[in-house]
Structure formats: C-alpha cells, structure tokens
C-alpha cells in the first residue's frame, strides 16, 4: 500500500513538471531571532537561544501560471530595500516577488533576510532591527515560464515590539540624543552611558519587552539585551558608530549568555558593557581594551572572523583621554 501511494505521488509530480509553468516551493524555514539570557546582578533569568536554527528543507511542486510582464516582479536589490522597510515598519506578513533570467540560490529567502539586517548606519536598522525580531518563518515559491524564473517569497515575522512602541522609542531617543549634539564622540558616549545606567533598572519579566530598547527606555527595566539595544540606538542617533555583540561572559564563576557594544572612537573600536557599568562599582567596563575585556567576555564566532575583525578593529588597550 505504501509503495502504491509513493508511486502515485511520483506520477503526480512528473505530470506537474511537464505541464508548463510550475511552482517550486521550499518548505517553511523557521528562524528564531537572537534572544539573550542575562547575567548581571541576581542572574535570575532563564537562558534563551542565541542562534536561530533552520529546519530541514524539502521540495514540493504545485502548478501555477504567471505573466512574465507582471509589474510586481522586481530585482533582488529592490526586494531587499522593500524587505528592510517592511521589517522596520513591523509588518507581520511580507511578500516579495523577484524575476530572474537564471535560477537563484535555494537559500534566497534567508539570504535576503540576513542582508536586510546588515549594518547600514541607520539608527533603527542593522543590529537594532535584528535583535528586535523574535522569529521569522520563510516560504519560497518558484515559477518557471518561458525560460524566466519568477520567485515569490513569503515572510511571517514575530517582533519583540510593535510599531507603536517603536514610534515612542524614536520620539524619546531623538529628544535624548539632541542634548549631546555638538559634543565630542567621547563626551556623547559618556553622557549616554550615564543616562542609561541612571534611568534603567536591571530586571526581567516574562514578556519580550525586557529584551528590547522599549523595555529599557519606557518601562525603565530590562536585561542586558535591552540595555545594549537602547545604548546602541542612542549612540547611533547621536552619530556614534557602534555594533551589538553577543556571546558569553563570566560572573561569579558562571558563564552565561550576554550582550555588549563595541564603539568606534577615532580609527578603532572599544569594548563597552553598559549593563555591567550599572553596578555598585560603576563604569568598570567603559571603553575597554580587548586585551583585558576578553578575560571575561567571549564573543560569538561570527564576531571573530577575519572579515569582521578587519572591519571592526578592536583596541588592545583601554581608551585614554588625549
């Protein structure tokens, strides 16, 4: 019976393959966004996975007709711009249409997704956007007709914050950042570091807001991810280049998942842990050199590649005022 069922399925697939245009669909890909556990103060929080996992992919075929003149089909560059825009706008359902003269990568959906989260220098994009996405499901359909490839890519996205909450963050961040305009880079870092440590309390609730800039800024309570994302957003709004780094850190002899920033001053970057700066011994991890910082902070592999290290060179020594 099983053999007969399998034979019928194979026959059906072959019929679809030779019946003109057809859709080549990748099974849904489930990519869980980074959600960090926290390690400062009481270490009360549960550890969540840092790295997303992709499910195995299988192929199914479905007949579909598509006009090759359909204006909704754009280039990859246009679709990348659209995807980034829709993610910033917290769209939960995103559909992209891409036309190509040649077959594109089987990882098209995930490739576009990761490219949309790359560093751009815009305050609410890049790392800030990346770490505010909780989960995304991806499905890709391919229609082949008249030697043209028509891709339809569906994204279903779960965010840590809503557009309304992000609008409130933007409003408050702009007001705070405006107070440091005209100051030097180091003065901006100092003042914004002090703002975060003075206004945010370390703590954890069961909702996603503890892991967001909104939780840190509006609720005034967050874990390390919330601290780091708020600091990232404030610095970017003030014109100070920085990246969010994830990894592990050791405190009280225990290694836990953690997040911090690297901040550009001059031609090099310095490690900076705003969460740990909010302690009874403040600012011990302020613009630190990597030679000492790496004694208890260990970046994930993606931040230790030759390309990343070359792009973001870390100072081996602590920052010294000129």
What are these regions (language model features)?
Residues 3-183, 299-322:
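N-terminal accessory/pre-domain segments preceding catalytic cores
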Residues 6, 203-206, 219, 256, ...:
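Repeated polar recognition positions within modular binding domains
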Residues 83, 164, 219-222, 251:
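Alpha-helix capping and helix-loop boundary segments enriched in small/acidic/polar residues
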Residues 203-214, 221, 242-254:
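Catalytic cysteine-centered active-site loop
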Residues 226-293:
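Hydrophobic/aromatic-rich core segments of domains that either
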Residues 283-309:
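Short, surface-exposed secondary-structure junctions/capping segments
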């Amino acid at each position: 019976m099983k053999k007969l069922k399998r034979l019928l399925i194979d026959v059906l697939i072959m019929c679809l393959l030779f019946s003109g245009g057809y859709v080549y669909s990748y099974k849904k890909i489930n990519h869980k966004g980074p959600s960090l556990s926290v390690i400062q103060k009481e270490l009360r929080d549960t550890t969540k996975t840092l790295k997303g996992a992709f499910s195995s992919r299988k192929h199914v075929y479905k007949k579909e007709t598509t006009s090759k003149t359909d204006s909704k089909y754009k280039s990859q560059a246009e679709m990348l711009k659209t995807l980034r825009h829709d993610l910033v706008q917290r769209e939960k359902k995103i559909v992209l249409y891409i036309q190509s003269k040649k077959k594109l990568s089987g990882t098209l959906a995930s490739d576009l997704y990761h490219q949309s989260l790359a560093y751009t220098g815009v305050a609410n994009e890049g790392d800030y956007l990346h770490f505010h996405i909780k989960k995304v499901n991806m499905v890709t359909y391919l229609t082949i007709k008249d030697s043209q490839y028509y891709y339809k890519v569906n994204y279903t996205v779960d965010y840590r914050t809503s557009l309304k909450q992000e609008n409130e963050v933007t409003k408050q961040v702009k007001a705070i950042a405006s107070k440091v305009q005209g100051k030097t880079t180091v003065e901006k870092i100092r003042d914004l570091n002090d703002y975060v440590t003075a206004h945010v309390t370390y703590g954890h609730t069961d909702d996603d807001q503890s892991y967001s800039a909104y939780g840190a800024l509006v609720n005034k309570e967050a874990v390390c991810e919330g601290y780091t994302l708020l600091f990232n957003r404030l610095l970017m709004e003030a014109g100070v280049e920085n990246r969010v780094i994830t990894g592990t850190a050791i405190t009280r002899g225990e290694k836990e998942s953690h997040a911090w920033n690297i901040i550009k001053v001059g031609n090099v970057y310095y490690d900076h842990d705003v969460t740990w700066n909010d302690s009874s011994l403040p600012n011990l991890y302020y613009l630190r050199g990597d030679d000492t910082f790496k004694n208890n902070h260990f970046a994930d592999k993606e931040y230790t590649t030759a390309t990343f290290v070359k792009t973001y060179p870390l100072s081996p020594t602590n920052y010294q005022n000129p």
